Amino acid sequence: VRAVWLNEFGGPEALVPGEAPDPVPGAGQAVVRVEAVNVTFVETQVRAGRSPFGNPRLPVVPGNGVGGVVVSVGDGVDQGLVGARVVSTTGGSGGYAELVAVSAGDVVPVPDGLDVRVATAVLADGRTAIGLTRLAGVASGEWVLVEAAAGGVGSLLVQLALAEGAKVVAAARGARKLDLARELGAHVVVDYTSPKWTDEVLAATGGAGVDVVFDGVGGEIGTAALRLTARGGRFVQSGLASGEWTDTSGPEVAERGVRLLGLAQVAPTPAEFRRLIVDALDAAASGRLRPVIGQTFPLERAADAHAAIEARAALGKTLLIP
């Protein structure tokens, strides 16, 4: 099958199109013919050898999330799964390919009427956004700051916070991303490349700051957002687009009673992890969640997809199409 290999850590050019053996399902596995591959920012870090979760052994076919059709199953798996439209995590690798073997227990059916590409777009980002919104306990009337608001997770967080009746401040960089945040319905839009962006947030909130921060950037942006968090507010660390987590060790957190929350608290058990995926698919099928698929690339152009994400040129979700 066609696949994309990572033979050595490096820039986007380290992703090399090639061939891989056709996968054969082992016991408890299913083979999926891939129609869409979810590409995440973390995968660009993995490719560069800077994974926050530990680097894989090379060579490897990257990719941790796919959507497609089950074409075969191994021993112990219901034959009725063959032909089903599904999304699935892959166990950390193997997704950048035409076919991939996955654990049958990780396969989640795609609701009737929902496009597989849309389903793939919410596999990771929808699961994460719903989990983070629930974790933060976003309530009607609260001010919510979403960093990286035009990204895959951020654009969904904006939608979910608005659905809860919150007043949303969307922070992003550049006119295209700010325009998208406005289209999504954000009440206030700020460009955090402006030196006065925090002043704009304080002005919008009457000087009180925000009740909830979804910190998808980290670094200096996250540190500034932490200072904007109101007394008793919630600071949710949801990503590190800057390459580093926000330093939350300062005394101001305790002094102002800010609650620190993070990704590790979202789905602590496999059952909860799966439940969030099902909820994300249901929300997408009903139209309550509308992922922004900003760009798609052919499988063999995975390097271009990574380059777009790293250049901050990507809007919403990026998919590979085999």
Where do the PLM segments sit?
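C-terminal hydrophobic helical "lid"/dimerization subdomain
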Residues: 1, 271-322
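N-terminal glycine-rich beta->alpha transition that marks the start or flank
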Residues: 11-14, 20-67
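NAD(P)H dinucleotide-binding glycine-rich loop of Rossmann-like/cofactor-binding domains
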Residues: 45, 79, 87-150
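A glycine-/small-residue-rich N-terminal strand-loop-strand element
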Residues: 51, 67-92
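Mid-domain Rossmann-like dinucleotide-binding core that forms the NAD(H)/NADP(H) cofactor-binding site
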Residues: 81, 120-194
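NAD(P)H cofactor-binding loop motif with strongest signal on the N-terminal glycine-rich segment
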Residues: 148-149, 217, 240
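Short amphipathic alpha-helix with an adjacent loop that forms part of the alpha/beta core around
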Residues: 196-207
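Glycine-rich phosphate-binding loop and adjacent beta-alpha segment
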Residues: 220-288, 322
